[in-house]
C-alpha cells in the first residue's frame, strides 16, 4: 500500500511512461485507481512457485517488453528474478539495514530515510526524477453497504492500524500497541486489520474494550 503514493507521483511526473506492477493477486485492487499502471498477478503457491515457477514468471515479464525493473522488495524471489532477467536494467531498493541497526542499538541518532523515500530512490536510480513531498492519492470509492453497516458513519477522522508483520522482530508488542490505540481512539475512529485466526482474536479483544475501535480482520477483501 505504501507504494501507491509513490507510483502516483511517478505517473504525474512521467505521464507517458507505463508502469507494470508485479504483485500477489490479493493486492491487485490497491492499484486500480492509478493512471498508466497495469498489474501482473503472481501466484507463488502454484504457477510461480519455486525456481521453476519464477523462471516461468520471468518469461512472462520478458513478453511484456519491460525495459527496466524497479525492485521495491529486494528479497530472495526478486534476486532470482534478477538473474533470470539478465540484460534488463534491474535496480533494487536499499533497505538501510545497517543504518536501522545502528539506530536501534544507540550507535547513531541520525534520522532514517522513510520507506517511501527509498522506493522513490529506486526509480531515480533508473533515471526518473520526481518528488513525493506532496503525494496524491486515487479518488476514494463508494463504500460497500456491508462496510458502512459494520463501521457506522465516518463523521471524524479514521485511522487504520495493522499491528502484525510476517516476522516477530518487525512487530510492535501487542500490549504497547493497545496503549497506542487507546490514545488514538479518543479523537479518531480506529479500524484494525489483521492476519490469521490468532491475530484476529487479539485484535477483537482490543476492539471490545473501546467503542471507537473496530476489528475488520477476516471480514472484508480489497
Show where each model-derived region lies:
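Catalytic machinery of carbohydrate-active enzymes
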Residues: 1-222
Amino acid at each position: 500500500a505504501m507504494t501507491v503514493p509513490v507510483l502516483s507521483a511517478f505517473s504525474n511526473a512521467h505521464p507517458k511512461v507505463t508502469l507494470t506492477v508485479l504483485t500477489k493477486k490479493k493486492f491487485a485492487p490497491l492499484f486500480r485507481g492509478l493512471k498508466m499502471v497495469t498489474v501482473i498477478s503472481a501466484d507463488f503457491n502454484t504457477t510461480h512457485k519455486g525456481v521453476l515457477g519464477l523462471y516461468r514468471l520471468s518469461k512472462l515479464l520478458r513478453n511484456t517488453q519491460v525495459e527496466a525493473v524497479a525492485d521495491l522488495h529486494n528479497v530472495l524471489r526478486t534476486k532470482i528474478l534478477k538473474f533470470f532477467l539478465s540484460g534488463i536494467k534491474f535496480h533494487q531498493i536499499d533497505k538501510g539495514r545497517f543504518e536501522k541497526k545502528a539506530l536501534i542499538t544507540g550507535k547513531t541518532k541520525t534520522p532514517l530515510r522513510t520507506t517511501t523515500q527509498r522506493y522513490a530512490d529506486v526509480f531515480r536510480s533508473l533515471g526518473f526524477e520526481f518528488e513525493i513531498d506532496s503525494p496524491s492519492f486515487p479518488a476514494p470509492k463508494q463504500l460497500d453497504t456491508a462496510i458502512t453497516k459494520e463501521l457506522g458513519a465516518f463523521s471524524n477522522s479514521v485511522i487504520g492500524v495493522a499491528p502484525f508483520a510476517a516476522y516477530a522482530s518487525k512487530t510492535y508488542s501487542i500490549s504497547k500497541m493497545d496503549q497506542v490505540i487507546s490514545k488514538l481512539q479518543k479523537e479518531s475512529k480506529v479500524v484494525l486489520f489483521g492476519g490469521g485466526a490468532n491475530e484476529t482474536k487479539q485484535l477483537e479483544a482490543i476492539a471490545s474494550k473501546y467503542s471507537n475501535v473496530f476489528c475488520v480482520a477476516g471480514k472484508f477483501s480489497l
